UniProtKB/Swiss-Prot annotation:
One CC-aspect GO term: cytoskeleton
Miscellaneous note of the record: There are at least six actin genes in maize.
GO terms of molecular function: ATP binding; hydrolase activity
Broad class of the protein's primary localization: cytoplasm
Record's subcellular location: Cytoplasm, Cytoskeleton
Matches recorded under Pfam families: Actin (PF00022)
EC number: 3.6.4.-
Swiss-Prot/TrEMBL keywords: ATP-binding, Cytoplasm, Cytoskeleton, Hydrolase, Nucleotide-binding
Intrachain S-S bonds: none
Keyword Cytoplasm: yes
Function description: Actins are highly conserved proteins that are involved in various types of cell motility and are ubiquitously expressed in all eukaryotic cells.
Protein name: Actin-1
């Protein structure tokens, strides 16, 4: 499978970013925002060779004159016309023609059946792929960490899931979805920075706040104590230079922002916190496998990149379980891309080659084939 010509393509379509590349590589070759922008007024961009849609970085750069849409919300595709993203991925980013390569796509846990069929249909009918497969994101993250059993706390820009997996199979009845994710944290940080007197409201400033969040935020092991420390000393303060050269100082906001993960009530959300969701998910599983799940809590997704999150998670879950139970939280260093890396590993296994859905099988059975072969 080392031959570049028939190397499978692995494409992880996230709410915030699309990550794409070739199976066997250790990192995705293309990572760009999952945004599709359409001109607000036709004819504004005179002489620019008007395009009807801009994707990814180009849409980001021209955002002043475009209406930006995220075709994927909360991890689930809701605008199929805007899945232009795929076209862009194959032709502009990877520079391959999809009819020459098998394609491995990822999907959110609990993805509606109609969505899986639609993905399958587009791949075979629009792109004429020779073969394709749809894998669940959390399972791929677990593979990337070298395990087949564990519970994955997968959290991205738009949605979080806790997914228990036993011997490579998800346990659907115990999957929990949290609509608490990166975007909510960016909103919260915008709000608490406003309290400090920095007005950041536009969509361009929102990107700045997201950058502040990614560079400076961290999770406190003991929130109350950290607040005391922040009041009495300036040890938590950091400065951040804005694009216009203005320097702002950020103190307790650094850990008040991700604290929402552990106390959603801070932003008025009634959802369970990440550690409660993980615990609830495990409690829905068979009593015999709980020990294996507590010992393999794997964090995945860009939203889990905050320093200190693994220790805090471990502390919070430990406080909920019997003292004899050993809790281990694993935070792989490259967890931002672990879904993609897991896909790359899976698609290059020799045993996986009989798992692909081929064009022939699709022609014979129709889109429903995806439920028979991908589970």
């Amino acid at each position: 499978m080392a031959d570049e010509d028939i190397q499978p393509i692995v494409c992880d379509n996230g709410t915030g970013m699309v990550k794409a590349g070739f199976a066997g590589d250790d990192a995705p070759r293309a990572v760009f925002p999952s945004i599709v922008g359409r001109p607000r007024h036709t004819g504004v961009m005179v002489g620019m060779g008007q395009k009807d849609a801009y994707v990814g970085d180009e849409a980001q750069a021209k955002r002043g004159i475009l209406t930006l849409k995220y075709p994927i919300e909360h991890g689930i595709v809701n605008n199929w016309d805007d899945m232009e993203n795929w076209h862009h991925t194959f032709y502009n980013e990877l520079r391959v023609s999809p009819e020459d390569h098998p394609v491995l796509l990822t999907e959110a846990p609990l993805n509606p059946k109609a969505n899986r069929e639609k993905m399958t249909q587009i791949m075979f009918e629009t792109f004429e792929c020779p073969a394709m497969y749809v894998a669940i994101e959390a399972v791929l993250s677990l593979y990337a960490s070298g395990r087949t059993t564990g519970i994955v706390m997968d959290s991205g820009d738009g949605v979080s899931h806790t997914v228990p997996i036993y011997e490579g199979y998800t346990l659907p009845h115990a999957i929990l979805r949290l609509d608490l994710a990166g975007r909510d944290l960016t909103d919260h940080l915008m709000k608490i920075l406003t309290e400090r007197g920095y007005s950041l409201t536009t969509s361009a400033e929102r990107e700045i706040v997201r950058d502040i969040k990614e560079k400076l935020a961290y999770v406190a092991l003991d929130y109350e104590q950290e607040l005391e420390t922040a009041k009495s000393s300036s040890s938590v303060e950091k400065s951040y230079e804005m694009p216009d050269g203005q320097v702002i100082t950020i103190g307790s906001e650094r850990f008040r922002c991700p604290e929402v993960l552990f106390q959603p009530s801070l932003v008025g959300m009634e959802s369970p916190s990440v550690h409660e969701a993980t615990y609830n998910s495990i409690m829905k599983c068979d009593v015999d496998i709980r020990k294996d799940l507590y010992g393999n809590v794997v964090l995945s997704g860009g939203f889990t990149m905050f320093p200190g999150i693994a220790d805090r998670m471990s502390k919070e879950i430990t406080s909920l379980v019997p003292s004899s139970m050993k809790v281990k939280v694993v935070a792989p260093p490259r967890r931002k891309y672990s879904v993609w890396i897991g896909g790359s590993i899976l698609a290059s296994l020799s045993t996986f080659q009989q798992m692909w859905i081929s064009k022939g099988e699709y022609d014979e059975t129709g889109p429903g084939i995806v439920h028979m072969k991908c589970f």
